[in-house]
């Protein structure tokens, strides 16, 4: 088997249907299998697959395994020499999988390769490649600033704006679309179970580079990542905080407890500044953004502040 495409589903049945349809329509001349695991969302994906995509191997988990463990379980059921971990809320634009596969085969030093991700409206999803998190780049991390200084090494986004179609070395590939050789995935120790959600892709890309391999961005392989499926359907404070918690765990694992503690302090300080700013500018923001969005922003940054000072804890 040339390729195993592994997809973790969680309340994303409609996205999954479109994702699979695009794979079948655009992926030619490859001997591939598709393995879908539902992480206890029980959204009817299994019935839909049996009815519309009987060639897809389906695994129904009775518990929510989280992204890492669910992918690892599906991996055990796969047989391909190459693996593609793909989000259910993605759709191929042309033969993206073939292009990634060809690139991986042509580059013996490649660890993980990833595609150019677009938002639903066709705009570039700048998070498809990033630098590994540091206190500085996370403290300054704002979409407006990233767009003003896209070539700054701080963000690790230069590859997105490179001329031509040749693969570009990058630090980190988005977990929405990650392709690698099976033996590389095994050598990294698979997805780390240190994270329930978020930073799993960061950790895997870091381990790939630790092996002396190079992660590549393939700009000619284009995939739409709707970003509205799975956990982002309703971005709760839990999900918002888990981004920071997972980054903290990554930094503790690879840069030490002191650095991770510094990250928490910096992020809690930044969150407090945001909360105070939202309150001080509330007369203007309530008019411009509305009560609902203002309250949501206040709630988000207050939760992150509480996390940073140790008043919010999630134990796994």
Q: Whereabouts are the PLM-identified features?
A:
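N-proximal low-complexity "stem/linker" segments adjacent to membrane-targeting elements
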Residues: 1-25
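A conserved acidic beta->alpha catalytic loop
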Residues: 22, 30, 38-47, 63
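Glycine-rich, basic loop-to-helix element that forms the pyrophosphate-binding segment
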Residues: 61-78, 99
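Short aromatic/hydrophobic "clamp" motif used to bind/position activated sugar donors
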Residues: 83
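Short, flexible, basic/aromatic active-site loop/helix in glycosyltransferases
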Residues: 132-170
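A short, conserved alpha-helix in the catalytic core of glycosyltransferases
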Residues: 164-165, 171-222
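Active-site-adjacent helix/loop segment of glycosyltransferases
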Residues: 206, 210-287
